[in-house]
């Protein structure tokens, strides 16, 4: 299977196709762009290897009743592509939760994604939507960090 070269335009188009109108993501068209040796890291986990990465994507889709992403910006410099996004996750018992973040994709010599690093404020974005945690969390953050 021949895949196209990842550029700002192709990443925007491919990632936009991931989230359908039912809110259940389908990453299968993206998996060919990942190296077998992909290292994925975000604020809560580090995953090594394509099989483990694909399993993590499946778990995330299974846990959410809906999952949507709005791409705000896609920028490329050499072998690094940056995405700025808003991901909205819905769970059965909780309100929709928007996460504001970015992803750094690093391409190897073959043009495959060898590293993906996601940056977001998991706790702040989630605590903002939990009635009893929002006020104490914001008070703590303001007091400790200004």
Residue ranges of model-derived segments:
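Hydrophobic alpha-helical core bundles mediating ligand binding, dimerization, or RNAP-core interactions
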Residues: 15, 34, 57, 85-87, ...
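A beta-strand edge to alpha-helix "cap/lid" segment located at domain peripheries
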Residues: 62-68, 75-146
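Soluble or luminal CAZymes and related metallo-dependent hydrolases
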Residues: 10, 52, 97
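A solvent-exposed, acidic/Ser-Thr-rich amphipathic alpha-helical stretch
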Residues: 27-31, 35-79
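Short, low-complexity N-terminal intrinsically disordered segments enriched in polar/charged residues
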Residues: 1-28, 32, 144
């Amino acid at each position: 299977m021949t895949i196209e070269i990842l550029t700002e335009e192709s990443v925007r188009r491919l990632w936009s196709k991931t989230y359908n109108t039912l809110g259940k993501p389908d990453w299968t068209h993206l998996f060919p762009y990942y190296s077998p040796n992909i290292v994925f890291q975000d604020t809560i986990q580090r995953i090594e290897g394509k099989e483990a990465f694909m399993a993590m994507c499946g778990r995330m889709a299974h846990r959410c009743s809906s999952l949507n992403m709005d791409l705000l910006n896609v920028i490329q410099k050499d072998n690094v592509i940056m995405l700025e996004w808003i991901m909205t996750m819905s769970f059965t018992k909780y309100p929709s939760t928007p996460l504001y973040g970015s992803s750094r994709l690093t391409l190897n010599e073959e043009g495959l994604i060898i590293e993906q690093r996601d940056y977001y404020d998991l706790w702040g974005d989630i605590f903002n939507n939990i009635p009893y945690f929002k006020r104490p969390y914001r008070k703590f953050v303001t007091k400790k960090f200004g």
